[in-house]
């Protein structure tokens, strides 16, 4: 008799949380629709991930191999998003993976939007490609705001995420360990090639650090609110 084949149980969509708007700003119906279309979202992220690694091909070619993990920021975090969604849907959730996806997609989704408006001057550049980047990365930030529906942002998991993305900020802008700074190449408007004393470098660095802090604060705030709610429920019981 052949051994039975194990078929993973697909996770159901979790109920909504009673979170304040600053922690869960998307309408509950939109969150639920996103989770219902999880495989579509995975496919879109997969396409974006492939494009993202292709986009970084020249920068990777100029970067020592050991530092490659810190260069392709956006495709790396969309890969985290894919892994987060798939692990949840297949009933194999990993808190650290969800935290990496949340912090990373929120951070780099918003970071690219900031860069396009402050450095690449998207409003006057007249380049449709810049607007493509704005829309695509705004979508990354928005999808991060759905993760709380199925994720537990434990303190160790958030700690792992902030350690990774904090390290990324350090080697991107402040202390390159091997070779030069590893931040994403900027557009031509405020940047002189190879010159890290220009305003664009400071703007990008400030945005990256602030967004790392913001995403960490939001993840931990969601954790605190849930613990408070559970405490109230136990008190009523």
Region locations from a protein language model:
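Juxtamembrane "helix-exit" motif on the non-cytosolic side of transmembrane helices
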Residues: 52-61, 113-124, 173-179
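N-terminal membrane topogenic signal
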Residues: 25-42
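Central hydrophobic cores of alpha-helical transmembrane segments
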Residues: 103-106, 156-168
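Hydrophobic cores of alpha-helical transmembrane segments in multi-pass inner/ER membrane proteins
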Residues: 75-88, 138-149, 205-223
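Non-cytosolic membrane-interface motifs at loop->transmembrane helix junctions
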Residues: 62-70, 123-135
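Membrane-interface helix-boundary motifs at transmembrane edges
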Residues: 28-32, 88-100, 149-156
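Selected alpha-helical membrane-embedding segments in polytopic membrane proteins
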Residues: 48-92
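Membrane-interface transmembrane-helix boundary segments in multi-pass integral membrane proteins
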Residues: 180-216, 220-221
């Amino acid at each position: 008799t052949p051994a039975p084949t194990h078929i993973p149980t697909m996770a159901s969509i979790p109920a909504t949380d009673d979170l304040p708007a600053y922690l869960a700003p998307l309408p509950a119906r939109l969150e639920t629709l996103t989770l219902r279309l999880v495989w579509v979202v995975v496919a879109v992220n997969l396409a974006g991930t492939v494009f993202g690694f292709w986009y970084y091909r020249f920068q990777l070619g100029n970067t020592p191999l050991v530092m490659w993990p810190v260069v392709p920021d956006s495709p790396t975090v969309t890969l985290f998003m894919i892994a987060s969604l798939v692990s949840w849907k297949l009933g194999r959730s990993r808190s650290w993976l969800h935290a990496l996806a949340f912090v990373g997609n929120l951070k780099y989704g918003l970071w690219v939007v900031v860069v396009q408006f402050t450095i690449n001057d998207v409003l006057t550049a007249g380049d449709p490609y810049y607007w493509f980047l704005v829309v695509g990365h705004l979508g990354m930030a928005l999808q991060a705001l759905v993760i709380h529906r199925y994720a537990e942002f434990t303190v160790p998991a958030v700690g792992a995420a902030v350690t990774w993305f904090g390290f990324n900020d350090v080697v991107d802008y402040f202390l390159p360990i091997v070779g030069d700074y590893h931040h994403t190449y900027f557009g031509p408007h405020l940047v002189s090639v190879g010159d890290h004393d220009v305003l664009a470098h400071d703007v990008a660095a400030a945005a990256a650090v602030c967004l790392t802090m913001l995403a960490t604060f939001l993840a931990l705030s969601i954790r605190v609110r849930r613990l408070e709610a559970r405490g109230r429920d136990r008190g009523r019981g």
